[in-house]
Amino acid sequence: MDIYQRLSGLVGNILLLSKLENQNIPMKKTEYRLDEQIRQAFLSLETKWTEKEIGSQVELEEVKYTGNEGLFMHIWMNLLDNAIKFSPAKGTIMMFLKQEKDSVMFILEDEGPGIEDDVKTRIFDKFYQADGSHKAEGNGLGLALVKRIVDSAGGTIKAENREYGGCRFVVELPIQKDEAI
């Protein structure tokens, strides 16, 4: 990625984050297939995961969701991009989507280095990058943006380490139509 694309992405993320924090985003709610959106996000990153020969395990239940489709694409693109970025070559990324009675749960796991305990509390802060992440492209805005979008939908996001290495992100979103963005 060249410097102009990175700068454009940075400016776009700063503006979007600012709008979210000031609640200046028009709430364009539509019903769409969340599983298809996640699948599209993953396929749009195909160049990155094929370059590293990363495999995938994908179990996405069919889920119709009402929310701001454009904003939600930022969630999946950022989480998937990070999973690819921090996964070792020939690693595996696992993603699961399931619908509960009152919520939808998305789980994304990778085989990367995981997250140090002192970092877990700060990874959703603006401009925060863990020491080891400076080797990879990024600006410390992606997860902050993801958190603001999830929060504005009345959902939750958490990051945890997997028992045998790697990281797990869990996003839970309410399915009540009046609470989704």
Which residues does each predicted region cover?
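Conserved glycine-rich
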Residues: 154-155
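Short helix-loop "hinge" at the ATP-lid/N-box region of the Bergerat-fold HATPase_c
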Residues: 83-84
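Short conserved segment of the HATPase_c
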Residues: 115-127
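Short beta-strand/loop element within the Bergerat-fold HATPase_c
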Residues: 90-102
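A conserved beta-strand-to-alpha-helix junction within the catalytic ATP-binding
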Residues: 28-46
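Short conserved segments within the C-terminal catalytic ATPase subdomain
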Residues: 48-57
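Short alpha-helical segment of the dimerization/phosphotransfer core of two-component systems
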Residues: 2-7
